[in-house]
Structures are given as structure tokens and as C-alpha cells.
A protein has these predicted regions:
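Aromatic- and charge-enriched surface segment that lines or borders ligand/interaction sites
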Residues: 100-150, 183, 273, 320
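Gly/Pro-rich hinge or "lid" segments in bacterial periplasmic/extracellular proteins
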Residues: 93, 156, 160-161, 165, ...
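Ligand-site clamp/hinge motif
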Residues: 217, 247-292
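Extracytoplasmic/peripheral linker and loop segments enriched in polar/acidic and small residues
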Residues: 46, 111, 374-375, 426-437, ...
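Structural transition elements
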Residues: 348-387, 405-410
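Periplasmic-binding protein-like
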Residues: 141-142, 197, 302-303, 317, ...
């Protein structure tokens, strides 16, 4: 999922998918049942009389339609309003959502048994047909979902043909066996399929509401959801407010009485509002204030691993970025140690690969160029540029695009300086607001651009499928039959060991072709009120459910 966030590193939390259903390729029925989690309040905790949460959310959301979003800020809000088949606990483990239990005998056909007390906010029951409708809507070309490929990646039956316009959406491999039994058929076995069902794109929508109001169904006065909260107010570029959904099946355990999301793009403003007591946790923090916050606000400063990678993409459809020598030269000349150590300094690690080290069942290998000194990398970069026809007399010139953010600006300026001083490249910086920036990348209107990706689930394929041919999400236009073959081979494998081996081959191919320049692995650094209970420090996907939170005295 595309991200506006900034920080990243390896941390102590390397979540493993522990359920046998999710990791194993067993041919026996694997049924899963858990006790649901809502605000788990330790004995003796004194709650504040006012249970209203205010949080920074980085930017104004582009949409609240789960089948039409692609960003992290949107997912944070939608997670409160709509509930999918599964959720996550505070440590990132998959737990029941609308589905109470599920089973499979071959990791190709999955049957989900829905809870009968799940209801929409208007009182309608949540049924298997709601999921059938929503999944078909996600792959329907008429919806134009920027994440339709996600269902194709699951190998859901006929998803690829439907998305390509070669088959009717009604042929998608989903069916309602009865009102409360939802079944999904895959083309190939995917042992981690249930984990993938926690994604925003596969959350259900209320058919009657969508069809009645069209694009306006997400307005507060029209919105019907099945999540723990309902949309109360949405003032664009100011705030999104929600209150508990009285029809939610587990509403009795929800403690908060109101949740407000603020689209604060400026990290200093976000920090200052926290310090003034106006918000309970920030979206992120300004890097230049990090050391001061370490000293002055140690109880509020939270740093945890984040399943995300920060990188620059090259538009391989434009000259000279169709030349691998140019792409490699630019990547080599980025001093990642300076960026992570001097510029950021919050625990981020240099990235020489796309998939973060904290990804479950994945142990990346640093490529040869990552083991060189920066002086050696710069020398090789100069040689490559000269081979590609560039010199002091004919310097490489281009524009680097980034979305509006002081932190992104600082990194872009630092890299601009590295490219100029290290290898004589002239770069112009251009910033755009989030929605415009997304459009520019999607339409290929850029030379090189800042990008970031956060895992949609905790498995390496969530990163590596991003680079498949035909997947232009985030503006990537990498074409490699060899790479595609590796990813398809990995998806069909039910062995963790075999998949990791294939993933390492795929990473090696990305190093060889360099369609992107990995820069660093994130951490999630933010200010969190000591009075906030239930904050999920162990969730590396940063999936926060307000139904699990509470405010202490």
C-alpha cells in the first residue's frame, strides 16, 4: 500500500503467522476459532470520564470507498468503519472479524463461516452475499479500482480474466453457500490467503447504499458500514469524526465514544498539537525534533518496527531511465548511511532491497554494491554514467518528484546534493499534493519520484508482486518476463523455505535491473499519549483498531 510515511528499520517484532492454516499446506481440514479482542483493560485501570480520541492522519483522504483507495491514510479511517473477514490483534496476528471460523482442505478452496450477529449500521444483517458483491466490485473494470490487482495476486479464480475485460465479473471464484457461509476458490494453493483477507480492498460495502447513492455513498448522511464506528462528520481538509456503531456485534466492548482523524500534513504542526494536549497520537514526528523529544517527552515517544520501505522509482518508459546504467548509477550514488544516520537517526536502516528485514519468513541478502564504501559506489556510478554517454560537458539532468512533506523534502534535497557532488548530476526538485502526486505517478508524468510501500500483509509477496509486469501501482513500469516467472513460481509454492529462496532470486534480479533505488527501511515513530491504553506496539503493519483503545485517567 502506498504511503506518505517516512521512517523505517529492523526491530524486535518479526511476526510469524502462527496458525497452521496459514502456514501449512496440510490436506486435512484446518478450522480456526479465536476469542475476539476488543478493549482489553487491565484490572485496576481507572478510565477517564471523557473517552474521545483525536489522532493525526497525515493528509486528507482521497476516498473512503474501500474498492477505490490505495493509500495508508485512507486505510486507517476505513478500518474503523468497515470490518472484513479477519482483523489483527496487537501483535499482528490474524483473528476473526466478520468470519468467526474458516477452513480449507487444500489451500485452494477456503470456506468462511460468518457470525450471525454481524450487522450493518442500518440494522441489515451482514451476509455472504455482501462479500460476493464487494469482491466482484473490486475486480469489475467499471469500478476502476487501483487495487484490483490485489485479488488477482491471490490467484482468485478468473480474477485476472475479469480485470482484463475478458470474462464477466460473475465468473469470479466466490460464492455464498448460504446467508452465513462464504466460499472462495483460488487457481493455485496460497497457504497465507487468510492473512491477505485483512486488506482494505476486500472489506465489504453495503450494496443497496452503493447502488442508490453512487459516488456519494461515502458521505456521512449516506454512509452505511459494518465496522465498530460509523461516520458522523467529514469536513474535507479539516476532520473526520466517527462514533460507535450501536449495531456492531461487539459494541458492548467499545470504550471510546468518539474518534476524530485530523489531516495534518505538517509534522511540526502535528507535534505541536500533541504537546498542547489537542491530539492523542501523531501520524509521525519531524525528524529535526527527534532528539529533543527523546529528552523531553520520553514517555510519549513511541518507536516500533514498520513493514515499509522507502525508495525512489525511475520512469523506465522515458529516456535516459530506460538505460540500466543510468538507474544503477543514481542508486549507487545515494549515501544511505548519511540519510539513516545523520538525517533521520531514529533507528532506520539502509535498504538495498525492496522487502524489509522484519518481513515474516524472509532474510534478505545485501547485494555486492551494498557492501562497498560510498567512495567505491560513487566511482562505479561515474563509470556507468560515462558509459551511458554523460559527462561534465553533457551532464544528466532530470526532475525528482515527491509528495508535499518537510521530511520528504529534506531527503530529496540531500539526495540532490549527493547526485550533484558525487557524480555531477543536475536535479530539479518538484513537490505535489498527495492526490496530484498519485495521479502523476499513475499516469507516468515524472522522471524519477519518491515512493514508499507498506506491506498489505506480512509476507514477502506483498512487496515483490508490486514489481510484476502490468502492475503499474505507484508509477512502476518494470517489465521482466524472468521476474514475472519467479513471482508466479513463488505464489504457487506452499513451502516457506522454497518461497524464500525464490524471493531472494527476485530481489537479486531487481538489483541487476534497478527499476527502483531502495533507500531505507522504516520505523514508525510518533508521539503517543501515556494516557492512551491498548496502543498496539507489536503490530508492524501499524493496524490500529480504535475499538481496542481506551483513555486512562
Amino acid at each position: 500500500m502506498q504511503t506518505k510515511k517516512l521512517f523505517g528499520v529492523k526491530c524486535m517484532y518479526k511476526n510469524k503467522i502462527t496458525q497452521a492454516l496459514l502456514l501449512g499446506a496440510s490436506l486435512t481440514v484446518a478450522a480456526t476459532s479465536f476469542s475476539s479482542l476488543a478493549a482489553d483493560i487491565p484490572a485496576g485501570t481507572k478510565l477517564a470520564k471523557k473517552q474521545e480520541l483525536v489522532r493525526g492522519n497525515g493528509t486528507e483522504v482521497a476516498s473512503l470507498d474501500p474498492q477505490k483507495t490505495q493509500g495508508v491514510p485512507e486505510s486507517h479511517v476505513i478500518r474503523e468503519l468497515l470490518e472484513g473477514l479477519v482483523n489483527q490483534d496487537a501483535n499482528g496476528n490474524t483473528i476473526p472479524g466478520v468470519a468467526e471460523t474458516w477452513e480449507t482442505t487444500d489451500n485452494k478452496t477456503f470456506t468462511f463461516h460468518l457470525r450471525k450477529d454481524a450487522k450493518w449500521s442500518n440494522g441489515d444483517p451482514v451476509t455472504a452475499e455482501d462479500f460476493v458483491y464487494s469482491f466482484k466490485r473490486a475486480v469489475d473494470p467499471a469500478t476502476a479500482s487501483p487495487y484490483s490487482w490485489y485479488l488477482e495476486m491471490t490467484t482468485m479464480k478468473n480474477a485476472d480474466e475479469i480485470i482484463a475485460g475478458k470474462a464477466d465479473k460473475e465468473t469470479l471464484g466466490v460464492k455464498a453457500l448460504d446467508d452465513y457461509t462464504f466460499q472462495v476458490e483460488l487457481e493455485t494453493a496460497v497457504p497465507y490467503f487468510v492473512v491477505m483477507m485483512g486488506h482494505t480492498t476486500v472489506k465489504p460495502v453495503h450494496k443497496a447504499t452503493v447502488e442508490k447513492y453512487g459516488e456519494k455513498w461515502t458521505k456521512p448522511e449516506n454512509f452505511v458500514g459494518n465496522g465498530a464506528f460509523v461516520l458522523k462528520n467529514w469536513v474535507v481538509n479539516e476532520r473526520i469524526e466517527m462514533v460507535p456503531n450501536e449495531k456492531y456485534w461487539d459494541n458492548d466492548k467499545t470504550v471510546l465514544t468518539k474518534v476524530t482523524f485530523l489531516p495534518i500534513e505538517n509534522q511540526v504542526a502535528d507535534m505541536n498539537r500533541f504537546l498542547a494536549g489537542e491530539i492523542d497520537f501523531t501520524y509521525e514526528i519531524p525528524n529535526e525534533h527527534f532528539r529533543r523529544l527523546q529528552k523531553d517527552e520520553p514517555e510519549s515517544l513511541s518507536i516500533k518496527g514498520d513493514l515499509c520501505t522507502y525508495y525512489y522509482i525511475f520512469n523506465t518508459n522515458k529516456k535516459p531511465f530506460d538505460d540500466v546504467r543510468v538507474r544503477k548509477a543514481l542508486s549507487y550514488a545515494i549515501d544511505r548511511d548519511i540519510i539513516t544516520g545523520a538525517l533521520l537517526g531514529q533507528g532506520q536502516k539502509p535498504a538495498y532491497f525492496l522487502t524489509p528485514e522484519i518481513t515474516a519468513n524472509f532474510n534478505p541478502v545485501t547485494p555486492a554494491y551494498g557492501k562497498l564504501t560510498q567512495k567505491e559506489r560513487d566511482a562505479e556510478a561515474k563509470r556507468l554514467l560515462e558509459e551511458a554517454g554523460f559527462s561534465k560537458a553533457n551532464p544528466l539532468k532530470f526532475t525528482l518528484l515527491y509528495n508535499t512533506s518537510e521530511n520528504h523534502k529534506k531527503i530529496a534535497a540531500a539526495v540532490q546534493s549527493m547526485w550533484k557532488k558525487g557524480i555531477g548530476v543536475d536535479v530539479t526538485l518538484e513537490n505535489q499534493e498527495w492526490k496530484t502526486y498519485l495521479d502523476s505517478k499513475d499516469q507516468g508524468n515524472f522522471d524519477a519520484a519518491r515512493a514508499g510501500w507498506c506491506g498489505d500483509y506480512n509476507e514477502a509477496s506483498t512487496f515483490l508482486t508490486l514489481m510484476e509486469s502490468g502492475n503499474t501501482t505507484g508509477g512502476i513500469h518494470y517489465l521482466s518476463k524472468a521476474y514475472d516467472a519467479l513471482i508466479q513460481k513463488a505464489i504457487k509454492s506452499t513451502s516457506d523455505v522454497e518461497r524464500e529462496k525464490i524471493y531472494l532470486e527476485a530481489e537479486a534480479l531487481l538489483t541487476k535491473d534497478m527499476p527502483i533505488a531502495p533507500i531505507y527501511q522504516y520505523v514508525k515513530a510518533r508521539l503517543v499519549s501515556p494516557k492512551l491504553g491498548g496502543y498496539p506496539v507489536g503490530n508492524v503493519e501499524d493496524k490500529i483498531y480504535s475499538k481496542d483503545l481506551y483513555i486512562k485517567e
